[in-house]
Amino acid sequence: AATALSAMTNQEIDLEIPVIRIVPYQDAPGLLGGAEIVETGILLEVSHDLKGIFMFLLNEDFTARMLQKLLGCEIVDVRRPDEMSKSAICETGNIMCCSYINALSQMLDMQIHVSVPSVCCDMAGALLSVPMIRFANLGDELMFIENRFCFDDASFVCHVLFLPELDSLKNMLDTLGLSYE
């Protein structure tokens, strides 16, 4: 992922080893800094052997910096992106999520199909309501991945969340030799 983002921006981007954990869904807003914090969310649905939703959540500073690098212009308001900005954000999220999806696919020996990404800028609580509405009766845990990017002498924390359907979470953890209670 860092290699692809570096190539896109023509600049070295370092990605530290991510922190990955399974957490209760209701803990996610707090881990993101609060339900009211504004994030840019890129959402991808996965299907086939593993079903659920991946979300790549970027803070406003990281979004503005990436767009500036990708588009070569100053971004005034990341909350109201134009079509070119949306496309660039979607591609960034697609690269990040698909790097984790490909790793899961290989590690679990599963085929995983990915939807076209969609993008929205809103408060974290609102962004998280999308998958919760869909999966409310299916499960209440998610894979929470914290990523730290370093470029331009700055450090940015972004998150990838995987909200699997309950059966997919059980199958994934069973395949990894972990128990699910």
Predicted regions and their residues:
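Composition-driven recognition of glycine/serine/threonine/acidic- and proline-rich low-complexity segments
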Residues: 1-181
